[in-house]
Curated annotation (Swiss-Prot):
Protein purpose: Methylates ribosomal protein L11.
One GO biological process term: methylation
Record-given protein name: Ribosomal protein L11 methyltransferase
Residues that, per the record, bind S-adenosyl-L-methionine: T145, G166, D188, N230
SUPFAM superfamilies: S-adenosyl-L-methionine-dependent methyltransferases
Keyword Transferase appears in the UniProt entry: yes
Record-linked NCBIfam families: prmA
Organism the protein comes from: Erwinia tasmaniensis (strain DSM 17950 / CFBP 7177 / CIP 109463 / NCPPB 4357 / Et1/99)
Catalytic activity: L-lysyl-[protein] + 3 S-adenosyl-L-methionine = N(6),N(6),N(6)-trimethyl-L-lysyl-[protein] + 3 S-adenosyl-L-homocysteine + 3 H(+)
Length: 293
């Protein structure tokens, strides 16, 4: 079934109000899109940030009388008669199949593959993590996840303990376990991430070696051979006193979720306790690694 799309441009301050107006006039969904394709990073908790120049896009059933919709919107105080808009028809697709075709097995480093369950494993003798996109962030497609996976693949993890701080889907902890780590601990503030990590660990046969905690549940005096935190620059700086003491002396630390432009500030927060390596970059993102002094 085809759909009808209406697009309007406005300021970020007015976008949500116009989105509500579209819903009130029959839109089945509303999305916000930056007119200039600039991302928004690290909104504060409880804050909905939109761009200064925002496209508000409403999706309508194909049978909708758009003349009635336009007439209804013209009464809105932000619009008025003759407001600027664009209407086009969009053909329907098999969105589930379309979505699935975008995910392929991906290789990281020399040994590690991340494979969606509906794809054949390219190399049965490699280290294969079976992982489908789901509730929690982390499938290997984002540059920060890729940087962390490549780093883990290059470490000797045999018999080691790893902490995945901000575990999301559990991809990093699970990859470490399949690369030879003896045990892993995943910590996340989101209960859905804890559940996603648990489900993914079971699917990969490593659930008996993965312990998962919300922050208030984690044991005191946690310590590990390897600590990885793929979160964001702000939390990495703020939580540096907590994260810095998780690796044992001589242990490895890997940090990502950091824009290359933010690297120096994050490095400064960890420089006292770690011998830091050169920053690794991928696209506009980076990874910071080091060894605990």
């Amino acid at each position: 079934m085809p759909w009808i799309q209406m697009k309007m441009n406005t300021s970020g301050a007015q976008a949500e109000e116009l989105g509500d107006a579209l819903i009130e006039n029959g839109a089945v969904s509303v999305t916000f899109q930056d007119t200039h394709d600039n991302p928004v990073f690290e909104p504060l908790p409880g804050e909905t940030r939109l761009w200064g120049d925002t496209d508000v896009i409403g999706l309508f059933d194909a049978e909708t009388d758009m003349a009635d919709v336009i007439a209804g919107l013209e009464h809105h105080p932000l619009l008025g008669s003759g407001f600027h808009h664009k209407i086009e028809q969009i053909e329907d697709k098999d969105w589930e199949r379309e979505w699935m075709t975008n995910f392929h097995p991906m290789r990281f480093g020399q040994r590690l593959w991340i494979c969606p369950s509906w794809r054949d494993v390219p190399d049965p003798n490699a280290v294969n993590v079976m992982l489908d996109p789901g509730l929690a962030f982390g499938t290997g497609t984002h540059p920060t996840t890729a940087l962390c996976l490549t780093w883990l693949d290059g470490l000797d993890l045999a018999g080691k303990t790893i902490i995945d701080f901000g575990c999301g889907s559990g991809i990093l902890a699970i990859a470490a376990l399949k690369l030879g780590a003896a045990a892993a601990i995943g910590i996340d503030i989101d209960p859905q991430a804890i559940q996603a990590s648990r489900d993914n660990a079971e699917r990969n046969g490593v659930s008996d070696r993965l312990s998962l905690y919300l922050p208030h549940q984690q044991p005191d005096n946690l310590i590990a051979d390897v600590v990885v935190a793929n979160i964001l620059a702000g939390p990495l700086r703020e939580l540096a006193p907590l994260i810095s003491v998780l690796p044992k002396r001589g242990g490895h630390l890997g940090l990502s979720g950091v824009l290359a432009s933010q690297a120096s500030g994050v490095c400064e927060a960890y420089a006292d306790l770690f011998e830091l390596d050169a920053v690794a970059e991928k696209e506009e993102w980076c990874r910071i690694t080091g060894v605990r002094r």
